[in-house]
């Protein structure tokens, strides 16, 4: 029975820490809201660079059809 209480306490502690890691940077949210995707490398055609992600560490790319 003690193990059950210990397990519940540990799980409660772990789930308390989770929301801090789920908060995204504002630029990442803006990229996703404009239907872009984050990329480690430069955007490849037909995608265009529309901003940054992860606090400026990544590129935000959006597919742009060629006309």
Curated annotation (Swiss-Prot):
Tissue specificity of this protein: Strong expression in the testis, liver, gall bladder, kidney, esophagus and crop. Also expressed in the glandular stomach, ovary and male and female reproductive tracts. Low expression in the intestinal tract. Expressed in the ovarian stroma, but not in the ovarian follicles.
GO CC list: cytoplasm; extracellular space
Propeptide: 20-25
Subcellular localization, as worded in the UniProt entry: Secreted; Cytoplasmic granule
Signal sequence bounds: 1-19
Keyword terms of this UniProt record: Antibiotic, Antimicrobial, Defensin, Disulfide bond, Fungicide, Secreted, Signal
Protein name: Gallinacin-9
Annotated gene: GAL9
């Amino acid at each position: 029975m003690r193990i059950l209480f210990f397990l519940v306490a540990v799980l409660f502690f772990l789930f308390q820490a989770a929301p801090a890691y789920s908060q995204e940077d504002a630029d990442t949210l803006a990229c996703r809201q404009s239907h872009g995707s984050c990329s480690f490398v430069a955007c490849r055609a037909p995608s265009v660079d529309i901003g940054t992600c992860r606090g400026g560490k990544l590129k935000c790319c959006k597919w742009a059809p060629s006309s």
